[in-house]
């Protein structure tokens, strides 16, 4: 067995665990930004899981433009730690939004730029997945409410609202969510590769 026999599973575990926590922190930032229902049970879980490190960071990092800057800094720090650990495991290349990012070949400054790309990719993905969930729910069980649906509606509202103003429902069908998914996918394709290219210099 080669050295990769244990390295690849370990890298997978590290990436999964780090990404899950980054997702929670970024979700907290987005939900605060959108003034989501704090008493929602999912919101409560996210708050409980992310409060301890944010409490520490907020002592040094003030809010900017009314937003929780500490949450963004925490995300970047965790992503950076993830990349450093993957470098230690001798993982030369990872994929960020399906774009190869040679984390083993760039400077630590380049890694920081990759962190921004990874965070931007996750940010877009959250809105994209929320739109997909909304489409699926509208087909399977429209009209039913649960805590997850409440948060999904909160996340998708600022994207769907301007589209719905310009594209009203036609024949009883609302195509705004499909348009939003298309825009988000194209946006991801256009935004992430240049950031990764910048970090690769």
What annotation goes with each model-predicted range?
Residues 2-201:
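Selective transmembrane helix interface/packing segments
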């Amino acid at each position: 067995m080669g050295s990769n026999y244990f390295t690849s599973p370990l890298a997978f575990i590290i990436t999964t665990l780090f990404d899950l926590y980054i997702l929670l922190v970024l979700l907290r930032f987005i939900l605060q930004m959108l003034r989501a229902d704090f008493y929602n049970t999912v919101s409560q879980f996210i708050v409980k899981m992310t409060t301890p490190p944010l409490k520490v960071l907020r002592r040094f990092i003030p809010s900017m433009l009314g937003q929780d800057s500490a949450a963004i800094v925490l995300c970047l720090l965790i992503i950076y730690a993830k990349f450093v650990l993957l470098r230690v495991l001798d993982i030369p290349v990872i994929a960020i939004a399906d774009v190869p990012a040679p984390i083993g070949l760039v400077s630590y400054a380049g890694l920081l730029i990759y962190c921004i790309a990874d965070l931007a990719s996750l940010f877009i993905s959250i809105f994209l997945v929320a739109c997909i969930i909304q489409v699926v729910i509208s087909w399977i069980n429209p009209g039913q409410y649960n805590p997850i649906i409440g948060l999904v509606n909160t996340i998708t509202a600022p994207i769907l609202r301007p589209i719905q103003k310009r594209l009203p429902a036609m024949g009883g069908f609302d195509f705004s969510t499909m348009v939003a998914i298309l825009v988000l996918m194209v946006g991801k394709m256009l935004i992430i590769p240049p950031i990764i290219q910048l970090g690769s210099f």
